Amino acid sequence: MAACGAKRWKTVAMASAPTVIAHRGAREAAQENTLPAFRLAREFGAEWVELDARRTADGVVVVHHDAQLADGRVLAELTVDELPEFIPSLAEALEECHGMGVNIEIKNLPSDPDYDADHLVSEAVAGLVQAYLGPERTIVSSFNIDTLDRLYAVDPTIPLAYLFAIGDPAMAIARACAHEMTAIHPYDPLVTASLVERAQDEGLAVNVWTVNDPERMKVLAGFGVDGICTDVPDVARDVLDTLEA
């Protein structure tokens, strides 16, 4: 029997060394989740960018971490024209990241004030992926399995990743396998060499978040993780290049 992630492994197994994934862009050097942050991520040597996706009242997918703006207004209750100019649409972000890989995290928890029970955001994201980057340069992640299941139903060619920050990593691996995932995205404190080995034995890539300590980056590289998601892609690039030298 084939390992659970084997059919799409090659889309995310990008190099022998871990891939540098810029968390919300180069967010230590520019405002997170903005076009300047994505430009800097490229300049700093990141191969991939991670960003957050939410849906506005008029159905536009935009890039923003929180469900609410700083003034308390909920994105899902506003049209795209009512948003601050620094918030890009997902289409604009994907255009900016042309030639890079993009990890789109769909924010859609039941506790969120903009919770999308119909998972319409998944349908919209699938269309944008095909229009701008294609599945080979994309992976879509979420803490919400149902959101990822909906995206898989719409377009099974797009690689998916299960995000988790708590709980038993073995259960997370099992869930990822049961739901047609390509990768797991564990919170760094949960990551051990045995977790990485077990996930990869199942054909799953392991992309770890959020790692800013150079020494920890070296440890994770030794574990053989596939990607390191970091706020400081320039630091990660230097560390990994030194290890490969």
Regions picked out by a protein language model, each given a short descriptive name:
Residues 25, 54-58, 66-67, 107-109, ...:
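Active-site beta-loop-alpha junctions enriched in small/polar residues
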Residues 130-135, 153-158, 201-202, 243-245:
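Short helix-capping segments at alpha-helix termini
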